[in-house]
Structures are given as structure tokens and as C-alpha cells.
Amino acid sequence: MSPTLAHSSPMISPALVARMTRTFVRVAEIWVPTKDGTKLQFLDGLYGSLSGFRAVSEPMRFGFDEGLPGKAWAAGHPIILKRFESSSFERAEAAKAVGLTCGVAAPVFAGDRLMAVLVLLCGDDDAHIGAIEVWHNDPATSYEMRLVGGYYGTAAMFELNARYTRFPRGYGLPGRVWKSGMPMIVKDLKHSKAFLRWQEATEIGINRGLGIPFPHASGQTWALTLLSAHDTPIARRFEIWVPSAEHDALIFNAGDCDQNTQLAADYAAVKIAKGEGTIGQVWATGLPAVRDSLAADTSPAGRSAVAAGLESMVAMPVMNEHGLKALVAWYF
């Protein structure tokens, strides 16, 4: 059994709860290969109040290079669509009807085997600040990472500057996850040496970031960055878990939470077994997972999240041909 968490979280004010309901990401979906491996089918998703869009999505199937999930499968790296069109997003009309306008799809591979595709969908909103970015390096043509595409809400100037930014290996959030081959959380961007665009970001309210690497068999590397703002957060908590030295449990590596600044102390002695809670399930299956309600997750991570007033989560494995390298979780 994992030890009891040492610290409880403070009371969450009603004003904060109201503010945090305006999330940057509106929908998260998981698509997995069918038994014959020819298509992608729906596994699970977080839709909030968009139950009608879920009903449209559940019966759908996507072939190789078909729709947003299928294009990420074919490409082998994250794909971002800033504007949905019927030619590239088969649910464009249904998405438009509920205010969804853009999205990103991130494939999960174990070696060359596709495990799943995680899709995040966003919508236009006059108040939305934040960013979801895809960066890329091709070593045959450059020593730097450049922006492939991104969604920035209303942060138009931040987007413009990003298009003219380049990151050498080991510099900035994209460059650091590229060099390490591991996910990374940057908290308190204003005082972080890891985030080179801190001044531009903090001026518009972006205060934390998550970077996830996507190495490719070609030797090219992509990086997905999620940049979260105070008022329209991508997530209220980010966590990274990694296998222990003995590979018999997952241990806490890094995290950042609005409502608990003592995550490292809380999790210092915590070990999550394979299959334990949502995080342990992701380790056991190699598949991303979503939870609409964390009340039933009795793992240390689940209990900590509930104590902080968090209700739902997305968890994604970062894998190679040998298995799990790290696990990234974000909570709402």
C-alpha cells in the first residue's frame, strides 16, 4: 500500500472555482486501433456538457491518414489543425455546432506499434489565452526546432513571435524536451530559466508549461507544448511520473498545482503500482486514459487531486520500444 499523503490542500474559494471552469481545452478523446489494425475506434473521452458531440463521435472509425486521428497515425507525430474543415476533420459540422474550431492529435507509439491517439479539441472564445504548440527539428536541414503550428486563443502577438522563434537543442521548453527525450514541466514562467519566452508569456497571463517529446524513427523530433494561463487554464495541475530504479512502481518526478504547492513533499514516499488508479492503469495498458470523475480513484494521486478540488484528468504514457519512459497527467 502507498503511504498516506502528508499534506491536505487549502479550501478553494468559490471565485476560483468559477474562474477555472473556463478551460482552454474543451474535449479530450482517446482513439485506439481496431482488432484488425485497419482503423481507429473510439475508446473514451472527456466532453463536459457536449454530450451531443460525444454521441456523434463514439460510432466513428478513422482509417490510416483519415480525419485528425488518422492523420496523426500516418504522420507518426502530433498534428494540429487550427481551423476545422470537412476535408481534414470529418466531424467539422458537428464541431462547429458546439463551438469547437481547432484541435491537436498526438499518437502514442511503443516502438513502431501504434497504441493510441490522444485528441484535444478547443473552441474560439474572446477570453481564451494560452497555447498548444507543435515544434519540429529535422537534423538534415537544421540544428534548431521551429514552430510547425499552434493554437493560441486570443494571444495573437504571442503567436506571431513564436513563428519567428527558433530553439537550439537544450534551450527553451521545446529544446529541453528534445535534448532529454523526456517530458518537462515549467512552473512560474517569470522566474524560470527553462522558458525563454517568459516575458511575452507572463504579459498575457501564461504562467506554466508542459512539454512532451515525440522522437521519430527518421531521426526527426517533434515536441508538443501546452502553455496554460491563469484564467483559462489548460489544466489546474500537471504531473510527471517515472518508473522507479527497480521498475516495480511509478514514482513522482515533477508537478505543479494551483491548490497544492507541496506536491513533491506529499508524493516523496509514494509509489504507484501497476494497475493502481488511473496512473497505474496507463502503465499497465500502455494506453492513455481519461477520468470524468476522480472520486473512485483511491490511489495516492487520485486522493491528492480530489483533496485539491480537482474532478477529472487525462493521463498519457511516453513510451519507447522497451516500454514506459514516463507518464504525464493533467487535471481539471
List the model feature ranges, each with a label.
Residues D36-S87, S142-G150, T154-S192, A249-F252, ...:
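Regulatory sensory and allosteric helical modules in signal-transduction proteins
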Residues V117-D125, A223-D231, A326-F332:
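Short beta-strand-to-loop transition segments that serve as allosteric relay/switch motifs
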Residues R22, M60-G63, A94-L100, T165-P168, ...:
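Short loop/turn motifs at secondary-structure junctions and domain boundaries
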Residues A28-G37, E133-T141, R146-V148, E239-H247:
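Short hydrophobic alpha-helical segments used for membrane anchoring or interfacial signaling
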Residues F109-L114, D125-D126, T141, P215-Q220, ...:
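Flexible loop/coil segments at beta-strand boundaries within sensory signal-transduction domains
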Residues M1-V27, D124-I132, A229-F238, V242:
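PAS-family sensory modules
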Residues T101-F109, R208-P215, S312-M319:
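A short, aliphatic-rich beta-strand micro-motif
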